[in-house]
């Protein structure tokens, strides 16, 4: 999946664009739309086009990282996690999306990543809130997933259970929704 314009706009709005190097709140040398790395040098200046190119390259790296989470994501949830990874890094993305955590738990946990240098940062708090809201707005309901289960899109038995858990769903809740649909159809 690729980041939509909604996700790109979110990242650009919170990162801002600076064409000269600066130190971010975590102390890293930064340029453009929050680009960091060994290629960023003190006193460096870039053009707007270079800032856009850095952003595009960085997005690809974070999109791959979000894809590796193996979560069953809608575009909105994907965009939220790319923004999160862009700002917090791949290591924190892995911690956030650890195996067994449901998508609702992930949405709640996003809010806790609002510190830099051990201090709560208002801008990070606002960003995490927007990312959490965007993420939640994309989570499929248990009923939607149950309909996919009934269409055999998730496999059978233990395979289905493991796939649902790996994708960030509560197996018990989805199974209850499946049973409710089956009971309703039996009336």
Residue ranges and their predicted role:
Residues 128, 132-139, 167-187:
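Repeat-associated, polar segments at repeat-unit boundaries in modular proteins
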Residues 142, 151-161, 171:
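Extracytoplasmic Gram-positive cell-surface binding/anchoring modules and repeats
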Residues 60-91:
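Active-site nucleophile-His-acid catalytic modules used for acyl/amide transfer and hydrolysis
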Residues 145-148, 153, 178-185:
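General marker for long, soluble alpha-helical cores
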Residues 30-32:
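Short hydrophobic-aromatic micro-motifs
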Residues 11, 78-85, 109-110, 149:
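Short alpha-helical scaffolding segments that buttress acidic/His motifs in well-ordered protein cores
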Residues 1-20, 26, 35, 40, ...:
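Long, amphipathic alpha-helical surface segments
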């Amino acid at each position: 999946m690729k980041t939509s314009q909604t996700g790109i706009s979110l990242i650009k709005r919170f990162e801002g664009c600076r064409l000269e190097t600066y130190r971010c709140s975590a102390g890293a040398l930064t340029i453009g739309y929050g680009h960091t790395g060994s290629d960023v040098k003190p006193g460096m200046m870039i053009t707007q086009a270079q800032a856009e190119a850095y952003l595009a390259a960085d997005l690809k790296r974070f999109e791959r990282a979000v894809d590796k989470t193996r979560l069953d994501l809608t575009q909105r949830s994907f965009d939220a996690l790319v923004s999160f990874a862009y700002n917090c890094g791949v290591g924190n993305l892995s911690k956030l999306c650890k195996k067994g955590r449901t998508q609702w738990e992930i949405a709640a946990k996003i809010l806790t990543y609002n510190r830099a240098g051990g201090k709560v940062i208002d801008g990070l708090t606002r960003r995490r809130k927007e990312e959490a809201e965007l993420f939640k707005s994309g989570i499929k309901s248990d009923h939607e997933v149950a309909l996919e289960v009934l269409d055999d899109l998730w496999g059978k038995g233990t395979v289905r259970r493991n796939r649902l858990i790996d994708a960030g769903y509560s197996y018990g809740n989805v199974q209850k929704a499946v049973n409710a649909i089956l009971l309703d159809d039996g009336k």
